[in-house]
């Protein structure tokens, strides 16, 4: 919005040309989202408290968590407000990638809001049924996957439609340009051609999988938001590189026209996330809830697809992956042993993984900060793939 206004006035007001710089708008987006969160945070928390949307705590979880019962949840709304306002102010609203990542983020946010609402109203920690939640996530994820399959491959909205129609006329068998291939980290000359169907399948798994992985990680005060900020900021660096014809050529990456605007969204997400952490740090005044976790996870997955860094997301989001795998292993092993021996057995003391460490004697703050440190190291490792190829 402000970019369009600046472009209209820059012939008369020369200093407005600074708005054309991605880096300037990225810093501005971070500060804007941060200030919105810090200013609106107390008001949002008061409103959530008045609405009595307190978190229902699992009785079979760590006993230290019982004191958190009643802490207002659905605080992810604060993050989404900061992201929305900051992105709309500072991003190029003619950019197609901005709108698809906004659609996924807020679409998943609505799913999370409904889930949180049911938890609060019915006092049931389970919320929306897994099948219902998965259906709506799949609907949004598949739409985004189909759109991104063609928008990543072309430089303009018109050519995106032309490419889609060419695929239809080919009997759904046409391939995609090389820029849509799966990039293999550390290997500068090796990519894996996905084709349309492979791209759609991978994108769907990345978006929906990331959303649920972040949601599973959101279990302790401040645990998930800092990794989201770190991973999102790192993806913003990739967006800046992939969106630049000069830097992408120098670093031997495919140039994705328009991907640079993802830096603005990542910056807004980082600022909003830090503002939320101000209130979510231990002891938390507010919880993110599914409205925030599902939305942020979906956003990370979508951005990773746009900048062609799906594998790097897997690396940098290693904490999210570990939390998800711990749940899958726990459930699978429990069901297998119950069918085999008549009694379910567990691999971990409790899943997701952060609860296992709590029950092993780690303090909540120790788990949180150590997971932050691990994520920071993984993000630095992921960023190293920019040059170590």
UniProtKB/Swiss-Prot annotation:
Biological processes, Gene Ontology terms: cell division; cell wall organization; peptidoglycan biosynthetic process; regulation of cell shape
Keyword Transmembrane: yes
Top EC class, one word: transferase
Keywords: Cell cycle, Cell division, Cell inner membrane, Cell membrane, Cell shape, Cell wall biogenesis/degradation, Magnesium, Membrane, Metal-binding, Peptidoglycan synthesis, Transferase, Transmembrane, Transmembrane helix
UniProt similarity note: Belongs to the glycosyltransferase 4 family. MraY subfamily.
GO MF assignments: metal ion binding; phospho-N-acetylmuramoyl-pentapeptide-transferase activity; UDP-N-acetylmuramoyl-L-alanyl-D-glutamyl-meso-2,6-diaminopimelyl-D-alanyl-D-alanine:undecaprenyl-phosphate transferase activity
Cofactor: Mg(2+)
Function: Catalyzes the initial step of the lipid cycle reactions in the biosynthesis of the cell wall peptidoglycan: transfers peptidoglycan precursor phospho-MurNAc-pentapeptide from UDP-MurNAc-pentapeptide onto the lipid carrier undecaprenyl phosphate, yielding undecaprenyl-pyrophosphoryl-MurNAc-pentapeptide, known as lipid I.
Entry protein name: Phospho-N-acetylmuramoyl-pentapeptide-transferase
InterPro entries: Glycosyl_transferase_4 (IPR000715), PNAcMuramoyl-5peptid_Trfase (IPR003524), PNAcMuramoyl-5peptid_Trfase_CS (IPR018480)
HAMAP family membership: MraY (MF_00038)
Lineage of producing organism: Bacteria, Pseudomonadati, Pseudomonadota, Betaproteobacteria, Burkholderiales
Topology in the lipid bilayer: Multi-pass membrane protein
Pfam family, one: MraY_sig1
The reaction(s) this protein catalyses: UDP-N-acetyl-alpha-D-muramoyl-L-alanyl-gamma-D-glutamyl-meso-2,6-diaminopimeloyl-D-alanyl-D-alanine + di-trans,octa-cis-undecaprenyl phosphate = di-trans,octa-cis-undecaprenyl diphospho-N-acetyl-alpha-D-muramoyl-L-alanyl-D-glutamyl-meso-2,6-diaminopimeloyl-D-alanyl-D-alanine + UMP
Keyword Amino-acid biosynthesis: no
GO cellular component: plasma membrane
Subcellular location: Cell inner membrane
EC number, UniProt record: 2.7.8.13
Pathway(s) served: Cell wall biogenesis; peptidoglycan biosynthesis
Chief localisation class: membrane
Transmembrane portions of the chain: 25-45, 73-93, 97-117, 135-155, 189-209, 222-242, 259-279, 286-306, 311-331, 366-386
